[in-house]
UniProtKB/Swiss-Prot annotation:
<protein>
    <recommendedName>
        <fullName>tRNA dimethylallyltransferase</fullName>
        <ecNumber>2.5.1.75</ecNumber>
    </recommendedName>
</protein>
<dbReference type="InterPro" id="IPR027417">
    <property type="entry name" value="P-loop_NTPase"/>
</dbReference>
<comment type="function">
    <text>Catalyzes the transfer of a dimethylallyl group onto the adenine at position 37 in tRNAs that read codons beginning with uridine, leading to the formation of N6-(dimethylallyl)adenosine (i(6)A).</text>
</comment>
<keyword id="KW-0067">ATP-binding</keyword>
<feature type="binding site">
    <location>
        <begin position="14"/>
        <end position="19"/>
    </location>
    <ligand>
        <name>substrate</name>
    </ligand>
</feature>
<dbReference type="InterPro" id="IPR018022">
    <property type="entry name" value="IPT"/>
</dbReference>
<feature type="region of interest" description="Interaction with substrate tRNA">
    <location>
        <begin position="161"/>
        <end position="165"/>
    </location>
</feature>
<feature type="region of interest" description="Interaction with substrate tRNA">
    <location>
        <begin position="37"/>
        <end position="40"/>
    </location>
</feature>
<dbReference type="Pfam" id="PF01715">
    <property type="entry name" value="IPPT"/>
</dbReference>
<dbReference type="GO" id="GO:0052381">
    <property type="term" value="F:tRNA dimethylallyltransferase activity"/>
</dbReference>
<comment type="similarity">
    <text>Belongs to the IPP transferase family.</text>
</comment>
<dbReference type="InterPro" id="IPR039657">
    <property type="entry name" value="Dimethylallyltransferase"/>
</dbReference>
<feature type="site" description="Interaction with substrate tRNA">
    <location>
        <position position="103"/>
    </location>
</feature>
<keyword id="KW-0808">Transferase</keyword>
<keyword id="KW-0819">tRNA processing</keyword>
<feature type="binding site">
    <location>
        <begin position="12"/>
        <end position="19"/>
    </location>
    <ligand>
        <name>ATP</name>
    </ligand>
</feature>
<keyword id="KW-0460">Magnesium</keyword>
């Protein structure tokens, strides 16, 4: 093993069983948990994000859960800063950071770093969110293609958070996000843990998922139905009662929340909301698989196996990550 301290990434698609395995690992290894999930950062968004229960969190604390109000944005850059601080604190106590979740952009930000982009501008962002509401995301994507075609080619037209951020960077700085990244890459050769540097840890990357994709789809449908039974609609209704929340915010655009919001807006029937929520979650899982297929040195585990804890411990022992 190198001189860098160890860290463990436990990745995988939604509904794969990441949290359960992570908790089992903390019972036998000197690990502390860090959540890697863009929905779990928001307070008051518990049911639709499949947030661990209060009892579970009390027994097995996760850092970076409930750290933002739904009216606030939370970027990959902010996550990287927060996660690096949490990892350093855990390491200083002689423990191992165990990062668990499915927001693959956050993992990539940790591993590869991020270009040093201009900070968020609340006024510019509000104006862009208003445009998105009034004109639609297709128009924002067209605007981005005019000023930053490279970013437009990378960002899906239905990804409001990344579209708005790319346009925000251009409007605030006068330079495209692509130009910022290219300059940062040229300047940051040899950097370590800065915004554009690499992660100063030796990482064991694990991914868990059912080998049968049909099983994952069944799990997704079952979990969405369970969320509805647990009061998901009422949770979103409470969010809608706040005057500072709207459908253009990153929190409300989260999978599941946007479909229930549209249902409460009268845009969808209950059956349509359920169907679209399940489809959107399956699409999220597909994107997560796409990220993971391109991930180097990842060790796969089958969600359906009954001995994943022992398999994980055997793998970690084989690569001497904790020695």
């Amino acid at each position: 093993m190198s001189g860098k301290p160890p860290a463990i990434f436990l990745m995988g698609p939604t509904a794969a069983g990441k949290t359960d395995l992570a908790i089992e690992l903390t019972k036998v290894l000197p690990c502390e948990l860090i959540s890697v999930d863009s929905a779990l950062v928001y307070r008051g968004m518990d049911i639709g994000s499949a947030k661990p229960s209060r009892e579970v969190l009390a027994a097995h604390p996760h850092r970076l859960i409930d750290i933002r109000d739904p009216a606030e944005s939370y970027s990959a850059a902010q996550f990287r800063t927060d996660a690096l601080q949490a990892m350093a604190e855990i390491t200083a106590r002689g423990k191992v950071p165990l990062l668990v979740g499915g927001t693959m952009l956050y993992y990539k930000a940790l591993i590869d770093g991020l270009a040093d982009m201009p900070p968020a501008d609340a006024a510019v962002r509000a104006a862009l969110e208003a445009q998105a509401q009034a004109l639609g995301l297709t128009e924002l994507h067209r605007q981005l293609a005019e000023v930053d075609p490279e970013s437009a080619a990378r960002i899906h037209p239905n990804d409001p958070q990344r579209l708005i951020r790319a346009l925000e960077v251009f409007q605030v700085s006068g330079e495209s996000m692509t130009a910022h990244r290219q300059r940062q890459f040229a300047e940051s050769s040899g950097a370590d843990a800065g915004a554009g540097g690499h992660l100063p840890y030796t990482v064991a990357s694990l991914a868990i998922a059912p080998t049968d994709r049909h099983i994952l789809h069944q799990r997704i449908a079952l979990r969405f139905s369970q969320m509805l039974e647990q009061g998901f609609v009422d949770e979103v209704r409470s969010l809608r009662a706040r005057s500072d929340l709207h459908a253009g915010l990153p929190s409300i655009r989260a999978v599941g929340y946007r479909q229930v919001w549209d249902y409460l807006d009268g845009k969808l029937t209950e059956n349509e909301m359920r169907e679209r929520g399940i489809i959107a979650t399956r699409q999220l899982a597909k994107r997560q698989f796409t990220w993971l297929r391109g991930w180097s040195d990842v060790h796969w585990l089958d969600s359906l196996a009954c001995d994943n804890l022992s398999r994980t411990l055997k793998y970690l022992g084989a690569i001497s990550i904790l020695s």
